[in-house]
């Protein structure tokens, strides 16, 4: 292990012990905001510190084994040789673990998200596929015990959605869904196809981190055009009697957000503003990421909405993620919500990208 990394880890251990002491300080316990912040810091430090302590223990085991190798008793030397090998192997394993734990964290990984699924090329079939994708993400969210709240929908004429936006909240949502942004392509025989021909359709998925109010970028009210209109679709008679739906246009960027799924105009406006903040933040992030990508191109994680990232081939039961050349014949399981077999390899590839970048520095 590099001396500089070892020194950083020693500093983290000191801070961990300091935070541990602060958490039992009565004045800190009384200050709930500070107590919460320190509890989070303690939790964030815990894994890397405990792993480093295991590393130090393995180092001590190597030293002890080396001492025992000098013993005159051949049985003790044989046992020491075994312990030496085990401790050395453990050091290498723990070094790899520490390397991953020391990777820069995306501060947004624990944020909730706005998931936006839009039908692209393919007409009715694209809208039906958008419905399938939304159902896939909803079921995956269920397995993760995340909460899904629909913000707005524009239903397709023959099922599915021309567009659907939902808020997904829970632990680590953005970190696990951020690689879903891009173009998802489907190849299958539509139900309306009498000749049995395979059609290709596409949908665009955007995953935007929800911006906490305290961190939201400032939106000037003078830059907004707000329209109210009567909500359509589900919600009973009530929604059609009042102009409760909201459309907000951000004039400088041309970004338009509609929300009509809440009962009151006030709630629809609040939701629409939250989606707008997420979209504007996403645009800022994309601009920054594009500048960084010109220096170093990541295979995964560009989040480019125009990038074709995945193909769902129904006749062959095949799903392919083009960014990491991953092909699985588990299409039915994936669209039923078992996304982990794709999410985990994408996260591992992203980690490998970050490790490679650290090696270049």
Swiss-Prot record:
GO terms for molecular function: translation release factor activity, codon specific. PROSITE patterns: RF_PROK_I. SUPFAM superfamilies: Release factor. Residues 286-305 are annotated as: Disordered. Keywords: Cytoplasm, Methylation, Protein biosynthesis. SMART domains: PCRF. It is found in: Cytoplasm. One of its GO terms (cellular component) is cytoplasm. Methylated by PrmC. Methylation increases the termination efficiency of RF1. The modification N5-methylglutamine is found at residue 237. InterPro entries: PCRF, Pep_chain_release_fac_I, Pep_chain_release_fac_I_sf, Prokaryotic/Mito_RF, RF-1. Its main location: cytoplasm. PANTHER family: LD18447P. Belongs to the prokaryotic/mitochondrial release factor family. Peptide chain release factor 1 directs the termination of translation in response to the peptide chain termination codons UAG and UAA. This is Peptide chain release factor 1.
């Amino acid at each position: 292990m590099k001396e500089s990394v070892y020194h950083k880890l020693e500093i983290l251990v000191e801070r961990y012990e300091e935070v541990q002491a602060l958490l039992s300080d009565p004045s800190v316990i009384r200050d709930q905001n500070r107590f919460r912040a320190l509890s989070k810091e303690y939790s964030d430090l815990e894994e890397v510190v405990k792993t480093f302590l295991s590393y130090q223990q393995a180092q001590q085991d190597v030293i002890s084994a080396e001492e025992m190798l000098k013993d005159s008793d051949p049985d003790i030397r044989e046992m020491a040789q075994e312990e030496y090998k085990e401790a050395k192997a453990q050091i290498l394993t723990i070094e790899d673990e520490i390397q991953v734990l020391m990777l820069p964290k995306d501060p947004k990984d624990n944020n909730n998200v706005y998931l936006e699924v839009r039908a692209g090329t393919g007409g009715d079939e694209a809208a039906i596929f958008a419905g399938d994708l939304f159902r896939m993400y909803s079921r995956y969210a269920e397995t993760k015990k995340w909460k899904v709240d629909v913000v707005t929908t524009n239903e397709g004429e023959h099922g599915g959605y021309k567009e659907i936006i939902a808020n997904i909240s829970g632990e680590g949502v953005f970190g696990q869904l951020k690689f879903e942004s891009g173009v998802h392509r489907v190849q299958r025989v539509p139900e309306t196809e009498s000749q049995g021909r395979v059609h290709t359709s596409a949908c665009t998925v955007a995953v935007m981190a929800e911006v906490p109010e305290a961190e939201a970028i400032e939106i000037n009210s003078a830059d907004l055009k707000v329209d109210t209109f009567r909500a359509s679709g589900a919600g009973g008679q009530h929604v059609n009697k009042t102009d409760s739906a909201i459309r907000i246009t951000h004039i400088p960027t041309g970004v338009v957000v509609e929300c009509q799924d809440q009962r009151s105009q006030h709630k629809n406006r609040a939701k629409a503003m939250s989606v707008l903040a997420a979209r504007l933040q996403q645009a800022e992030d994309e601009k920054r990421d594009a500048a960084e990508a010109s220096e170093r191109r990541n295979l995964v994680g560009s989040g480019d909405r125009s990038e074709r990232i995945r193909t769902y081939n129904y006749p062959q039961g095949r799903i392919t993620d083009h960014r990491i050349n991953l092909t699985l014949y588990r299409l039915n399981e994936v669209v039923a919500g078992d996304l982990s077999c794709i999410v985990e390899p994408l996260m591992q590839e992203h980690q490998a990208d970050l490790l490679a970048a650290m090696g270049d520095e």
